[in-house]
Amino acid sequence: MDASVSLLPEGESLHRSLSASQIQMLAFGGIIGTGLFLGIGSSLAESGPASLLISFSVLGVSVYCTMLALGEMSVYMPVAGSFCTYVGRYVDEALSFSLTWNYWLNDTIALASHVLATRLVVDFWLIPTEGDPVSASLSLPPWKEAVRIITPITSLSANIILNMLPVGGFGEIEYWLSSIKVFTVAAFIVNGILCNLGVNNEKKFIGFRYWKDPGAFNNGIIGVISSFVNAAFAYAGTESIALTAGEAKSPITTLPKAIRFTAHRVLLLYIISVLVVGINLPYNTPGLDGDSVRMSPFTFVFKKFGVPGAASIMNLVILSSALSAGNHSLYAGTRLLYSLAKSGHAPKVFSKCNKHGIPWLSVLATSATAILCLMSSQAGKTWGFLLNVIAVSNQISWIFIAVSSLRFRKALRVQGKTHRLYFPNWTYPVGPYIIILLNGVFLFLQGYKSLYPFRLSLFVSYYMEIPIVLGLYLIWKIYKKTKLVSSSEADLETDWKSLEDTDSA
């Protein structure tokens, strides 16, 4: 069966109800989350502030190129399956099968990580010590233990309820949740700069003091390389803006605006944020270690700022950001499972939508996996494991977005249809090769620290995604006997016509 997902009449499929502003903030909601607020803390502890800045800057270039490459294809062909569909159209249906299932699994794990993060965040109020929250919890009173259990359950329940709303209402809620996050990051940057200049508890100028003592780098070149997996986790979700293409109003105009808006602002906010964190906190700050996440580095800086209640307000925003990011992961995973069902790669029942155009069975199935992670007794270690898996999964996806982009352009050229590009990727052809090179190198090198000494759990978290993707690919390749799609035969028509009809409607 064909790997594509055609746009069906509105009553039978997803509804086009998302405006440009909602898509922009939905993208922010998926990107700005626990990866930035919590993930950079463990990266700072393991690698140092300079390594953190290098990894976010270098990988930021790759992410920017990825968003433009994907945006070019999404505007041309706005479908719910996004790059997973494009891989099937322009490369190989077996690869589409493999990547879509893997990316769906990635979104279920991402949802679990955001849900689990809420438990880590509330530890700021529940655990007064600076030690490991897991150890400290042994002496916590029953009501505090109850809060630690109820919080992630409530977060997951809220994610499910919000994803059952009509997509227009869901987009509006995400718009405001994401607006809060963007405002908070901007406020953090301003307060962090003031804190560095001397507006802090010690009333002293900090500057780059911590880049000298304890230092700018930790663990040398290994620290630099390993920091890229944390950066990849923080940038996870940048590619999922294209998943809104199937529900965007007038995608030919709304998607380019949303992609430009998101790409530039995310990179700017991220790089400045990691710099501000790196100049205000030494890498040996207690509680930043990935195995015992004490609190967000953002909360540390606000606490250092000295304003009463500022740290608690920051922590509350981080809690809401985990809810927002969970919403986005569930939204993305739901649309992928819907896409799989439409293409015949999953049971057809998952393509069933209610009267509001919500694939409600896909919502329930995607959220089910997150429940397993709620039973973990060591939230910090489990969250760190999930972080690595999600990061690697996204790097694999970015590589094949680039491959699809190259094949897409070749198909347009061979068939004489390059004039149809509404949103040309100005980084082509250099951009896709940058994506493949950078992510390909770090995909294999960043897990080096798991080898010396060898740590099985850490090794699995870095490399389990590779055999999963390869195995799924070979299973479908052998079963369906698929072949590489010829550039002269690649389908450039089906959803391009739907795009014209949609925008003229």
Swiss-Prot record:
Spans traversing the lipid bilayer: 25-45, 50-70, 149-169, 175-195, 221-241, 266-286, 305-325, 357-377, 383-403, 425-445, 456-476
InterPro entries tied to this protein:
AA-permease/SLC12A_dom (IPR004841), Amino_acid_permease_CS (IPR004840), APC_YAT (IPR050524)
Q: Give the originating organism.
A: Schizosaccharomyces pombe (strain 972 / ATCC 24843) (Fission yeast)
Give the family from UniProt.
Belongs to the amino acid-polyamine-organocation (APC) superfamily.
The protein's UniProt keywords, in alphabetical order, are: Amino-acid transport, Membrane, Transmembrane, Transmembrane helix, Transport
Protein name per its UniProtKB record: Probable amino-acid permease PB1C11.02
Recorded hits in Pfam families, A to Z, give: AA_permease (PF00324)
Q: Which domain of life is it from?
A: Eukaryota
Membrane topology (UniProt): Multi-pass membrane protein
Please give the GO cellular component terms listed in this UniProt entry.
membrane
